[in-house]
Amino acid sequence: RQRQMCIRDSVMAIRFKADRPGKQNLTFSYSPNPVSTGSMSADGANGLAYTAHLDNNGMQYVVRIHAIAKGGTLSNANGKITVKNADEVVFLVTADTDYKINFDPDFKDPKAYVGVNPAETTRQWMDNAVAMGYDVLFKQHYDDYAALFNRVKLQLNPDAQSANLPTGKRLQNYRKGQPDFYLEELYYQFGRYLLIASSRPGNMPANLQGIWHNNVDGPWSCLLY
């Protein structure tokens, strides 16, 4: 399983592969945020679109999901994309809001912070992503973030431990008090990766929780400090 957030192309790409053909059987569904009001609809034969607004401030947003399978079958019904007996499946996700960065707003204007139409931007991003395909998206993502990521290297232990041990097992051992320098290196670089993927010139800086938590209103209101 591979996942990356492609800033350059404004799309999240998730690829599932198995070591044997025809073994990908899974269902993709989107769980709406509990403090929003919206509706789910089919978006083409292999896609879903969720159009909604937040209940507290009315901010509009759209989430699109599109599936691409090699082998097997795809079905799209009741707000779910079901994949059966595929060799490989890629899910593409685009999302946007109508929020506009405005450093000098007219507070009497109810549209002071309203910008793009998210239905249009997410459609354009999705069409571009589908046309490029996973391999092109991955290369562009890698080239984009690696230019920043590869500026720093951290090696805490010259006798590097095996990198093949699953992260879940590493965390389990670490909680039991077993030292793992590789895990500490991994967490350091993972934090850098998230920051690189969440804050770039021209956008808002990363807030207290970053953009990767699962709440509309995170702890401490996700303020900027």
Model-found features: residue ranges?
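Aromatic-residue-lined binding/catalytic grooves and analogous aromatic/hydrophobic interfacial grooves
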Residues: R1-Q4, R8-L224
